[in-house]
Structures are given as C-alpha cells and as structure tokens.
A protein has these predicted regions:
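P-loop NTPase motor domains
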Residues: 1-244
C-alpha cells in the first residue's frame, strides 16, 4: 500500500480513513515521535476514541443547516429510493428546528446530540387531540415571542403543519434515524470535542478515522467529520489566511 509510506514521510498533515486500525498502528507512533498531534475517531474500539462533537463547528445558521443535510444523507442507506420524499423532508425540518434552537438558545454544554435526543422526547403528540400543546411546542412559542424571525421557529412550524398521526410518525422516524446517539459509547464520543478541526492546517497533526470493515452502523460519524473538516479548512484558508 502506498498509504503507509506516504504517511511515514511525515512531510504534511494527514486525514486518513483506516479500516481495522492497521494504518494507525503502523504510523501513529512514528508521527507522534516527529511532533505530530494524533487525533482518532475510533469506531472499532469506541472507548478508545477521541471526542467529536459536530456542534463545535457551527458558526452560523448555514452551518447548522449543512450539518442536518449531511446527517440525513449519511444516515440514508445507499441505493435506497424513496417513493415519497415527504418523510425525509419532514424529518429534515424537525432536526433543523431542534439543532438551530440548541445552537442559538442553549448553553454550550447542552449543544450536542444527547440533548437533541432529549428534546425529541419533549415533542409529544396526541393523535386524538389536535389541540394538544407539547412541552416542545411551549418552548418554541417562548422563543417566537422573543425572536419572531427565528429560523428555528419557522422550521418547527413546517414540522407542525403535519396532522397528529403524521407528526407522530415523523417523530418515530427521526428517533430511529438518530438511535445510535442513545448508545453510551456514542454519547461519550459526541458529548465533547477533541478534534479541534480548525487547527488541521495550522500545526502538525494527523486525523485518523478508524472504521470496522464489516459494519457500517456508525460510519455516518465519519461522513460528518470529513464534511466539517473540509469546511473548517476552507474557512481557515478564506477567512484567516485570506485565500493564501
């Protein structure tokens, strides 16, 4: 393989997809001896992973919307063809509302996917009572009073256009999509951040995404990580180094 020899030259920064942890084992120690910071998203041995919290890389509303779109794409099985895109669009609106709300309203320690899952629990729907107001409805009503132009509120209203039974199906579908974030090991990874993606182009570092070769259950995290890593590099080049 040409990957390991290239890395062992230690002449640039690296972002490496590493099935079964073989590349990290062969090159990580060498890079560390040569002054590199090593960051690892480890989906083979979850307990050994560094933290990765996608919320840490949201600078504005556009970033939040990108995160949701990337999450939806990364958690949709490849080759699947929807007969009705309504459900995915409805899930997207709900997730945009919740993630924007946390990004704009919540303290930093609550900006993570564990809190997204908790917020989903507040979105109760009673099929027999279309007038029922859930705890999450009350929260968004309070936000609307303070900030009538809130994009989070607008997206929540899109979700609320659905009737009771349909809303319940949207909630279930969203919760199933995000089910991995209920696992303690994934929660431990995504509740904090060690990746420091904005420094990828600033100092010697290597980022390894260690993935199993026989299970893709959590690979969506790698997709999110790569998308945000490249966004961070573009931001650093354009805004900090002014395109240099």
């Amino acid at each position: 393989s040409y990957v390991k020899p290239n890395i062992l030259e230690a002449n640039t920064n690296y972002v490496v997809t590493d099935p079964k942890q073989e590349v990290l084992t062969a090159t990580g120690g060498w890079l560390k001896q040569n002054g590199y910071e090593i960051r690892v998203l480890n989906l083979v041995n979850l307990e050994q992973s560094d933290g990765y919290n996608p919320f840490r890389y949201l600078r504005d509303e556009k970033d939040a919307l990108k995160l949701v779109n990337n999450l939806i794409q990364a958690t949709t099985p490849k080759g699947s063809h929807e007969s009705d895109p309504f459900w995915t669009k409805a899930e997207t609106a709900l997730l945009q509302a919740i993630i924007l709300m946390l990004f704009q309203e919540a303290p930093e320690y609550e900006q993570n996917f564990s809190m997204v899952m908790r917020v989903l629990e507040y979105a109760e729907v009673k099929e027999e009572d279309e007038e029922y107001i859930s705890p999450l409805d009350l929260l968004f009503q309070a936000i609307e009073q303070d900030r009538p132009d809130s994009v989070a509120v607008r997206q929540y209203k899109v979700f609320k256009m659905a009737a009771g039974k349909t809303s319940k199906s949207i909630l279930v579908s969203t919760a199933v999509r995000l089910a991995p974030f209920n696992l303690p090991q994934i929660k431990a990874i995504t509740d904090h951040d060690d990746m420091d993606l904005y420094t990828l182009g600033e100092k010697k570092c290597a980022l390894y995404a260690v993935i199993p070769d026989n299970d893709t259950s959590f690979n969506f995290l790698v997709s999110l990580l790569y998308a945000q890593a490249f966004q961070a590099l573009y931001y650093s080049a354009d805004q900090i180094h002014h395109g240099a």
